[in-house]
From Swiss-Prot:
Cofactor names: Zn(2+)
Species this protein is from: Homo sapiens
Protein name: Aminopeptidase O
Signal peptide annotation: none
Motif Nucleolar localization signal boundaries: 689-699
Annotated compartments: Nucleus, Nucleolus
GO biological processes: proteolysis
One Pfam family, short name: Leuk-A4-hydro_C
Task performed by this protein: Aminopeptidase which catalyzes the hydrolysis of amino acid residues from the N-terminus of peptide or protein substrates.
Cofactor: record remark: Binds 1 zinc ion per subunit.
Amino acid sequence: MDIQLDPARDDLPLMANTSHILVKHYVLDLDVDFESQVIEGTIVLFLEDGNRFKKQNSSIEEACQSESNKACKFGMPEPCHIPVTNARTFSSEMEYNDFAICSKGEKDTSDKDGNHDNQEHASGISSSKYCCDTGNHGSEDFLLVLDCCDLSVLKVEEVDVAAVPGLEKFTRSPELTVVSEEFRNQIVRELVTLPANRWREQLDYYARCSQAPGCGELLFDTDTWSLQIRKTGAQTATDFPHAIRIWYKTKPEGRSVTWTSDQSGRPCVYTVGSPINNRALFPCQEPPVAMSTWQATVRAAASFVVLMSGENSAKPTQLWEECSSWYYYVTMPMPASTFTIAVGCWTEMKMETWSSNDLATERPFSPSEANFRHVGVCSHMEYPCRFQNASATTQEIIPHRVFAPVCLTGACQETLLRLIPPCLSAAHSVLGAHPFSRLDVLIVPANFPSLGMASPHIMFLSQSILTGGNHLCGTRLCHEIAHAWFGLAIGARDWTEEWLSEGFATHLEDVFWATAQQLAPYEAREQQELRACLRWRRLQDEMQCSPEEMQVLRPSKDKTGHTSDSGASVIKHGLNPEKIFMQVHYLKGYFLLRFLAKRLGDETYFSFLRKFVHTFHGQLILSQDFLQMLLENIPEEKRLELSVENIYQDWLESSGIPKPLQRERRAGAECGLARQVRAEVTKWIGVNRRPRKRKRREKEEVFEKLLPDQLVLLLEHLLEQKTLSPRTLQSLQRTYHLQDQDAEVRHRWCELIVKHKFTKAYKSVERFLQEDQAMGVYLYGELMVSEDARQQQLARRCFERTKEQMDRSSAQVVAEMLF
């Protein structure tokens, strides 16, 4: 795929002025309306000004420089003051059915005059424009900047937390007897800093404060990427109200969620893992440094199930016959991008009861597992942490639930349900305590653009992992489970360092899966070498068809993690639609970690990794945090001239294939499983060369039974053959039952069908493009490149059927291929 780079189109601005003020907690109160495809309600933000949180986090690098005396570089928008008498008065005209909203209020379907929505502008993104200082500029009012896109903001007001009975005890200063801005802000300051053991009380106070009356509307405006709020006369973050309520609604075209139908034809909506994350779902602070907690009440028609990334397993509360309410919360501060919701007619599948406590206490710790029980206080900000809970650290299998559309329950019962316990147990045996207390697994609609996505307490999986046996399902499950540690419990402080999430998950999925299968060491090593062989081939392909600047794992180099004085920044290529299909960060990151593990030895490496997890869970990291600790914790004789600078130069800051990896692949011997595949390839080449009419006595070729990864490698080798006859292709299909294999195998099979114009199997290609949308994008390109009229017609026909439901980025990429 020829990727064209355009900074004005592709760069993603993070606008929030997190150096001046931080959101510590969100309270969402939302209604989901499937008829209008809108989510509407309020969000209350509890804030902490910059001076306070900088003192509390003295170990974190100083993010805010001295404030500039110059005015902010972008023009101050004319603020709008929207009088809304009652944005949610009940409408008797609203009809309720299976798919309708249940709400406390009327839904405003048109933007009111004067309401400044986020409008798309044709002008390009300028990093200087978006990285401006929004702090105090003498006589100007302080501006709270939130990341926001595709939202209709109706009203912003200050919340009178002083009106909540019982909260006056949080005011320590006896001179603050009159209710004032300072009085209210002190209440919030004390509330957000309550100790972790009072988390239930804290959540209760947050909920009560969120329902307190307003005490004055605030001026606000919106542009393409932000919501800007100010209060006349409040010139610093300290003076700005620390509890504000925003009334808003999403737009059907908003890019944070997808409104679609599930595989049973029922409507649903879910966060799709958009490049813009959640800023089209609620106004928030997007930069990872803005770690916050949240609680949410979501109402939907009674036939729907609401799943969220909360730590509690919510049950519905029936409000009236046709409406239910769901309540979720989290107590571990995390970036707003990890907030996840899925509302649909999901069916929960029951499984056999697993007693994780029994599993944890039936046997003593092995010597290697003793490393899990590190002594010492956690290094993160205070929250109720599982790593300090003795029973949690020994819990091999956390409570889990599985949800899917009703038509897929059988497939889930056959594969997914029975794989979750051994995969969770395997992850625990490698890394120790699960960072999160529970797990929901949801099979999402066919338009989901990847095979899986992990969030705190919930995981989305594509339907593509349910076919063709256990292998693809198990490996993907292990990949997403690994993200609980790397990507979620430990996050990247700079989003450009994706390898810190995807590289680790890719490396760990093999280790988890081998452990879950209880493979002997030799078998595990062979399978891992085979997967390394496949990834090596994929990395070579990736290097050939991606721009050099997108092949670098640490593109900002010494400026990694840096922001403007306000905290705003720009993510290079963050909006490039082709980026979600690239695997450079997965593959190069995987090979770097594999290189380090081989250099140190598995025992030393994984012992270190457990120590690293214990040290850095609940925190954001940069590459140097991992590499410096690694090198400090290994003996000199195993370091072998490794240094942070060398690793930067060879692996993280250069494009192309790293030189140490090239040397390793040249010197390494082929594993036994790969050699077996080569022998089978030779047989098939021989079969293909035979004349159509064979002698009767000629011996029929006997083919070996192959593992799924071996089948993938076999088909990739056969793709290198210039011609394969229809007879050979038919024999291939019959020998390996290719139409029934997993999606990875079927993808390569479809490539063979397209390359050799095997018309008898075109139905398999059509099926793949419709049912395996997470993997089908490149197949569209191959159909068009062939310049075969029938194949191009097939591609356009499939796209016409699926484009309305297809993921937006995928549809954009495919449309550019077809037209």
